[in-house]
């Protein structure tokens, strides 16, 4: 789990899968295309990138009048990670869920987007259904296998280009089979690693890939205050924060959240789901 989760939340997550400085993920040629509005009943998606590649969303961009950039909104996102080979560890008592974190989000009334793995949904179907039927949340796709969609990527095994679409569709199927209803057509690459080949492979799925501009640093952290401070220092109007929903490898996220939320609200921020952030 070490390398997998570290890559999932790493500040070095990047398009090519190679390390860069700890800033926002590097943009690809397909990043930040123009918004495209779906039917009124559905969540927004982005228009395809150059050459029809899967579009990539990292944060809310400024509108022509700058209004969108000055709107003090922020999206907290949580990766529900569990790799395909960790069922035995879960059966042995290791916790890859974090019901306390979800309870805190409900208590604090924080709309959030959970990027859920298909394997996680299979292991915790009741929790997946509870999250996915609560209008406070929306569930997005974080793959089924947590294999890398471009390599190298923090030691993750690679998924072949011909299997990428099936991996994503398998995850959506596993999530929906739990009874989750609030499922959005967004996808987060394991490790944040992608390239043009993976963007091309996923284009037929119609998903919008979602990255981030603020890394919480909660993976394997032991100091909740340090995690909270990193988020509070990094957030700007329109930011998208990556955190985790797994007690096994992100044990202080719940504690950090209880400082992050009041801290940002004191600064005038409003919490939104990715779908609202994308809607602009």
Q: What residue ranges belong to the model's regions?
A:
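Short, low-complexity, disordered segments immediately C-terminal to signal peptides
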Residues: 1, 8-34
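Structural recognition of the beta-strand scaffold that forms the well-ordered cores
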Residues: 74-77, 112-116, 138-141, 185-188, ...
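Acidic-and-aromatic substrate-binding clefts and catalytic sites of carbohydrate-active enzymes
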Residues: 84, 92-93, 116-125, 188-195, ...
């Amino acid at each position: 789990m070490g390398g997998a989760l570290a890559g999932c939340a790493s500040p070095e997550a990047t398009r090519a899968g190679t390390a860069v400085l700890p800033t926002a993920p590097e943009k690809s040629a397909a990043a930040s295309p123009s918004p495209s509005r779906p039917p009124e009943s559905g969540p927004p998606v982005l228009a395809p990138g150059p050459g029809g590649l899967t579009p990539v969303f990292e944060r809310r961009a400024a509108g022509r009048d700058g209004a969108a950039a000055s709107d003090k909104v922020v999206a907290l996102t949580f990766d529900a990670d569990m790799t395909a080979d960790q069922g035995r560890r879960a059966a042995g008592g290791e916790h890859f869920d974090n019901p306390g974190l979800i309870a805190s989000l409900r208590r604090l009334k924080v709309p959030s987007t959970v990027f859920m793995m298909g394997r996680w949904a299979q292991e915790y179907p009741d929790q997946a259904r509870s999250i996915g039927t609560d209008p406070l949340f929306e569930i997005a796709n974080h793959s089924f296998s947590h294999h890398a969609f471009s390599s190298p990527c923090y030691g993750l095994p690679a998924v072949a280009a011909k299997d990428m679409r099936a991996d994503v569709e398998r995850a959506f199927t596993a999530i929906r089979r739990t009874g989750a209803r609030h499922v959005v057509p967004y996808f987060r690459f394991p490790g944040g690693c992608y390239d043009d080949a993976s963007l091309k492979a996923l284009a037929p799925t119609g998903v919008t890939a979602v990255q981030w501009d603020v890394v919480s640093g909660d993976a394997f952290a032991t100091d909740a205050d340090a995690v909270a401070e990193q988020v509070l220092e990094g957030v700007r109007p329109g930011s998208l924060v990556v955190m985790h929903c797994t007690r096994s490898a992100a044990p202080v996220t719940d504690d950090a959240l209880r400082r992050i939320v009041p801290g940002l609200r004191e600064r005038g921020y409003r919490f939104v789901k990715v779908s609202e952030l994308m809607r602009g």
